[in-house]
Amino acid sequence: HLCDRRQRQMCIRDSPIFSTEATAKLCGIMLPDSAHIQEQDAEYQNRKNERAGKPLVEPLYTAQDAENSLRLFKGVRYDSIIQICPGVEARFTDVGHLLGSAAIEVWVTVGGKKTRIVFSGDIGRDDRPIIKDPESPEGADYLVLESTYGDRLHTVSTDDEKEQEFAEILREGIARGGNIVIPAFAVGRTQELLYYIKRFLVNGTVPGLEKVPVYID
């Protein structure tokens, strides 16, 4: 991650940004929205800094930065081999983490020798309701692997068990006449929650759910 705004501007000034097609489309929505939040946060912090006599801060990136970067995006289909520059080729493979996520296979040719490097990115799980199962690139000379959880193991539970647990939470909340607040990532998790809520409504799994308004921020 580049933390200095000037460094980021230098990196993206004229360079193409290769991504999956879905990622490019999502960024058209998410980057301007995130930039607006960055500008608001900086404005709020600067009001406090002015009162305290502290230096002003700049937003991590602005709406103009976002607009400039979006012009550089090049959406690429999964499994298509593209040339990044002479001697460097790449391919995106669907890893089932969220819409547009990918592992990146990179082939680098130096002195007639081709080396294959695989960057895993965040890897999803099998049997997700709205995302394809992850695919595994075959073979690599070097593998750069995500390790979000280190050496910890996930608690093993089936999707059916998780769905029933979610349904039970909703049933309890409705029975108490209370509100249920669910923090969730805007991309991926929120859509999955909506999928399950729709299933509950169609199947009648959660009595009274049809009378409950659902709001998404």
What label would you give each PLM region?
Residues 3, 20, 121, 145:
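Active-site flanking residues adjacent to catalytic metal/cofactor-binding acidic residues
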Residues 67-132:
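Core dinuclear metal-dependent hydrolase active-site scaffold
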Residues 28-72:
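Acidic/polar short surface loop at catalytic or gating sites that assists cofactor/ion binding
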Residues 103, 124-216:
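Cap/insert and terminal regions of metallo-dependent hydrolase folds
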Residues 13-35:
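Hydrophobic or amphipathic alpha-helical targeting/insertion segments
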Residues 2, 22, 184-187:
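Short, well-ordered beta-to-alpha junction loops that form the rim of enzyme active sites
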Residues 1-8, 12:
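Single conserved hydrophobic/aromatic residue that forms the stacking wall/gate
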